[in-house]
Amino acid sequence: MNVLSCSINTLIKEGLYEISGVEVGQHFYWQIGGFQVHAQVLITSWVVIAILLGSAVLAVRNPQTIPTDGQNFFEFVLEFIRDVSQTQIGEEYGPWVPFIGTLFLFIFVSNWSGALLPWKIIQLPQGELAAPTNDINTTVALALLTSAAYFYAGLSKKGLGYFSKYIQPTPILLPINILEDFTKPLSLSFRLFGNILADELVVVVLVSLVPLVVPIPVMFLGLFTSGIQALIFATLAAAYIGESMEGHH
């Protein structure tokens, strides 16, 4: 990705005075064989996964009849994910709860980590650490996983008859129906990436221009929208899976 420079300039007398510059797109690479891997995305993703696994183990390692606060919280999250899955997928939602739950929790914690974890204090030879969902590679990977999931759901339920949906309700819509399946992962990935990147850029620019206390309301708004984006992604993933199993909607 080319370096994207966003500069805010103020006209002073005869020239422009640069107040703030924010660069996005520099990466720290690991060379693995003949491949270059975005190291900072892997590092932050591993941290998020460790947080999720550690929290789950601590909360439910010793289940109680009268649940503790941690166990109660995770049971609430599980019930919430089950409700979302059942609403969007229908009666056969059960096998898809782990997939939808994993998507929701990974995206939710990734988004919040961008605002709550001090990634910037860890210095890298190139680039800087940020939320995993701040990188287009992560959001595209999540969207492609979703695409693979709804194709698998449709084929496992209907076999090759799944592809008959492309000519419903009329064969004239064949190109549009095919295009729809290709645009779903694009819309999922760019919606999530754009919202998280824009939120972090706004906070960085405000912090560089005004005292820290001023951007705090924007940071709280970012936490709220980050949670909403995780819910939207998981809900759409469940809806696509339900649609592929039920037929043309």
UniProtKB/Swiss-Prot annotation:
Superkingdom of the source species: Eukaryota
Gene Ontology CC terms, in alphabetical order: chloroplast thylakoid membrane; plasma membrane; proton-transporting ATP synthase complex
Major localization class: plastid
Annotated transmembrane regions: 40-60, 97-117, 136-156, 201-221, 222-242
Entry keyword set: ATP synthesis, CF(0), Chloroplast, Hydrogen ion transport, Ion transport, Membrane, Plastid, Thylakoid, Transmembrane, Transmembrane helix, Transport
Keyword hit for Transport: yes
GO MF term list: proton-transporting ATP synthase activity, rotational mechanism
Subcellular location: Plastid, Chloroplast thylakoid membrane
InterPro entries, alphabetized: ATP_syn_F0_a_bact/chloroplast, ATP_synth_F0_asu, ATP_synth_F0_asu_AS, F0_ATP_A_sf
Function: Key component of the proton channel; it plays a direct role in the translocation of protons across the membrane.
Alphabetical list of NCBIfam families matching this protein: ATP_synt_6_or_A
Subunit annotation: F-type ATPases have 2 components, CF(1) - the catalytic core - and CF(0) - the membrane proton channel. CF(1) has five subunits: alpha(3), beta(3), gamma(1), delta(1), epsilon(1). CF(0) has four main subunits: a, b, b' and c.
Family note: Belongs to the ATPase A chain family.
Record protein name field: ATP synthase subunit a, chloroplastic
